[in-house]
Amino acid sequence: MPGGKGKSIGGKAGSKDSAGKTQKSHSAKAGLQFPRGSVKRFLKNNTQNKMRVGAKAAVYVTAVLEYLTAEVLELAGNAAKDLKVKRITPRHLQLAIRGDEELDTLIRATIAFGGVLPRINRALLLKVEQKKKGKSDS
């Protein structure tokens, strides 16, 4: 027998033409936009003792990163829209993150060129109001 061990001649037996199939990445199969392969490589390279990283773990971490990014960008886009500009700047990111209580506790980093939140202490406001009342009474 020319093929040996039951193999047929001329390619795989019973398979469709490979031109009819389209290849899908792992990210596309999971419905993600972020690259699962890059995240998995990052996880493998940055773990202690060269631990193994499962495929599902990489998909899960990628999905979490994608969700958090979408959340921050949505809030920053709303902040930019409120200020009537079309470009998101670090200031808009700062306003978005510090305005949301959960994101503020999660992201404690200092954002470069983010500025500070507009806030006036109540004690200072009370002093100004008392001075105005004193001037209006006299």
Curated annotation (Swiss-Prot):
Keywords: Acetylation, Chromosome, DNA-binding, Nucleosome core, Nucleus. It is found in: Nucleus; Chromosome. Residues 1-13 have a biased composition (Gly residues). GO terms for biological process: CENP-A eviction from euchromatin; nuclear-transcribed mRNA catabolic process, non-stop decay; regulation of transcription by RNA polymerase II; silent mating-type cassette heterochromatin formation; transcription elongation by RNA polymerase II. GO terms for molecular function: chromatin DNA binding; identical protein binding; protein heterodimerization activity; RNA polymerase II cis-regulatory region sequence-specific DNA binding; structural constituent of chromatin. Residues 1-36 are annotated as: Disordered. SMART domains: H2A. Transmembrane segments: none annotated. The modification N6-acetyllysine is found at residues 5, 12. GO terms for cellular component: euchromatin; nucleosome; nucleus. Acetylated once deposited into chromatin. Variant histone H2A which can replace H2A in some nucleosomes. Nucleosomes wrap and compact DNA into chromatin, limiting DNA accessibility to the cellular machineries which require DNA as a template. Histones thereby play a central role in transcription regulation, DNA repair, DNA replication and chromosomal stability. DNA accessibility is regulated via a complex set of post-translational modifications of histones, also called histone code, and nucleosome remodeling. The nucleosome is a histone octamer containing two molecules each of H2A, H2B, H3 and H4 assembled in one H3-H4 heterotetramer and two H2A-H2B heterodimers. The octamer wraps approximately 147 bp of DNA. H2A or its variant H2A.Z forms a heterodimer with H2B. H2A.Z associates with the vps72/swc2 subunit of the SWR1 chromatin remodeling complex. Also interacts with rbp1/DNA-directed RNA polymerase II largest subunit. Belongs to the histone H2A family. This is Histone H2A.Z. The lineage of its organism: Eukaryota, Fungi, Dikarya, Ascomycota, Pezizomycotina.
